[in-house]
Amino acid sequence: MSNVRYISNLTRETYALILAGGRGSRLHELTDWRAKPALYFGGKFRIIDFPLSNCINSGIRRVGVVTQYKSHSLIRHVMRGWGHFKKELGESVEILPASQRYSENWYQGTADAVFQNIDIIRHELPKYVMVLSGDHVYRMDYAGLLAAHAESGADMTVSCLEVPIAEAAGSFGVMEVDEEMRILGFEEKPLQPKHSPGNPEMCLASMGNYVFNTEFLFDQLKKDALNESSDRDFGKDIIPAIIEKHNVFAYPFKSAFPNEQAYWRDVGTLDSFWQANMELLSPTPALNLYDAKWPIWTFQEQLPPAKFVFDDDDRRGMALDSIVSGGCIISGATVRRSVLFNEVRVCSYSLVEDSVVLPDVVVLRHCKIKNAILDRGCIIPEGMVIGYNHDHDRAKGFRVSEKGVTLVTRDMLGLPVGYE
């Protein structure tokens, strides 16, 4: 059998479950009204678009999206952008909200979120189940992960990458492996992670992406459901319980393309979210959103092109080293090194620098803004200065991050809340 057909068979026999119910509490007010996977990224996308696009580009066409925390905007986005698949052709993207199938509880953990959907997975008759995190930004060919899983004879395979120990401490599941990448030990979010072989500054961290043989997964979930002391979590409970008696392997994260650096970002803090968006402004960013070989799919709103108006010496509409999305109007203002999402308006004599501006924001005249995140629907009053003095920002009720990024939301401006 050719390698292409072999991979095609593997992906056709796989059901992917994307866990998209998390809040992302380290993002503070930015996730007060939306789940983290519904958060905007890169000018026109939402975070959930990245694992979904990875599935489609990898040939996996049966996908479930598990939702829970403040899921309205996430559900609406998936229905609009991903509802065109045809069930009769064996392809679908289904939304799986917490519905108390097996108990009166909502999803209690990552493993419980899968356990409560066993009947839906079983109906699809997959040979393999892929469980994916829905709150990271990355490009990954899941077909390579599936092939490694099948060829190793594994019961479970955990996708992993090397991260600095200081970054992993308290944040990532960390594993120990042998020469064949068999997992020998696993700790969930240890405060003192064990380092990688031969590299005392790095450790092998779980990406939260797993492949299981289907019946093996069901057996382990049922056992875990009977354990009253379990946290119902893959990293805390399932993986540590199975590594001694079963074949559990690690799969090092690779780029979707040869000779290209692998890209993965955890945008779980205000600083990391801001930084990951700023990286896109590089002439050759690590994440190439313009690569036609691996497109990132999303809901395409019907919007007019961006417009730049006025060309006077003291009133010139322009954007430099920036991403400016559809429906934006830069009216006699200057935008530098910033990411502007859909339908942002920046009015005359204002300056926006080094900022991430989410959809439907209006910056009125004579404003100066830098190193900021402006949440959706903000209306910045005329003459307001943001990002130049952190004490003044805090006095206005804005949040300033550890690295000096100022977050502004509608609530902080005294506007009606509930924008998603």
UniProtKB/Swiss-Prot annotation:
Gene3D superfamilies: Hexapeptide repeat proteins, Spore Coat Polysaccharide Biosynthesis Protein SpsA, Chain A. One of its GO terms (biological process) is glycogen biosynthetic process. The keyword Nucleotide-binding applies. The keyword ATP-binding applies. Alpha-D-glucose 1-phosphate binds at residues 107, 173, 188-189, 206. Pathway: Glycan biosynthesis; glycogen biosynthesis. Pfam families: Hexapep_GlmU, NTP_transferase. GO terms for molecular function: ATP binding; glucose-1-phosphate adenylyltransferase activity. It catalyses: alpha-D-glucose 1-phosphate + ATP + H(+) = ADP-alpha-D-glucose + diphosphate. InterPro entries: ADP-Glc_PPase, ADP_Glu_pyroP_CS, GlgC_bac, GlmU/GlgC-like_hexapep, NTP_transferase_dom, Nucleotide-diphossugar_trans, Trimer_LpxA-like_sf. Keywords: ATP-binding, Carbohydrate metabolism, Glycogen biosynthesis, Glycogen metabolism, Nucleotide-binding, Nucleotidyltransferase, Transferase. Its EC number is 2.7.7.27. Homotetramer. HAMAP family: GlgC. Involved in the biosynthesis of ADP-glucose, a building block required for the elongation reactions to produce glycogen. Catalyzes the reaction between ATP and alpha-D-glucose 1-phosphate (G1P) to produce pyrophosphate and ADP-Glc. Belongs to the bacterial/plant glucose-1-phosphate adenylyltransferase family. This is Glucose-1-phosphate adenylyltransferase. The lineage of its organism: Bacteria, Pseudomonadati, Pseudomonadota, Gammaproteobacteria, Alteromonadales. The gene is glgC.
